[in-house]
Amino acid sequence: MNKEEVVLAIRNSGANAVGILKAREFLELEEILKKRGKVSLVESDIKKRTNPFLMMKDAKSIIVCLFSYLPSNNERISVYAQGLDYHIVIKKRLEGVTDKLSENGYKSMIFCDNGPMSDRLLANLCGLGFFGKNGMLINERIGSYFFIAHILTDCELEEDKPAENTGCIGCNRCIEYCPGGALSEAFGFDENRCVSFLTQKKGELSPEETEIIKKSGYIWGCDICQKVCPHNKGIEAEIIEEFKKDLITDLKMDEGISNREFAKKFSDRAFSWRGKSVLKRNIDLFNE
């Protein structure tokens, strides 16, 4: 398959943007990741995060895709988790692309926020966006409300060059409005004060952590730094049907619901992986 055929297949899958990188060891990312230090919920081995050959020895290309989701509204669940689980939806949509690659004799692997490599850094390298002070990747056309996936393949494709982006305008609104004060100048980030991290954290919360969550109004995730970002104003992006239907914007938990019942009821939602106890704890904070 040539690049044009691959890009067309990606577009037909419902992706809003696509970029391609040559598979290589991304040594320039090692320093960035070292400076960031240990971050929860992501691969800790920097080599695995920067070397695609550890997953596919004969990899030739990395195809990076953006899938838009609905902008934030008035909710208690972060908008990314309101619709059907994006891991499942995007993987299923991209299987049409990997099937075509297979038919042409190529191997491929799909990753959507479930692989060791950094989707955001890969997307940045192939020109799909720039970083805001909130740490989100921002695309000039569709803002930052999108999921990122990538396909690793042994099909050799022409690489895309990083685009000349205008970059973050530096208004500091995300820093100003962050309920926990997790953001700071020079793109600083403290996950222990981030509402999204705290609502996913297991175990007992400290009084300060509890107050941060209650201040935000969210029981899962947080969209405030995206909601106030000027780069998300006036954007128009096509959104696939799976991310527009059966939305859950709030959640009440029956006292008697078992872990098994919870898992069955919400198995198609991105928030279900943390289990009942974390969500119930968060909900109870607003009933005190």
Which residues make up each language-model segment?
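Iron-sulfur cluster-binding cysteine motifs and their immediate structural context
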Residues: R173-T199, K214-F243
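Short, charged low-complexity linear segments at domain edges
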Residues: N139-P162, E191-T210, N259-A263
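Long, compositionally biased charged/polar accessory segments in the mid-to-C-terminal portions
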Residues: K264, S272-E288
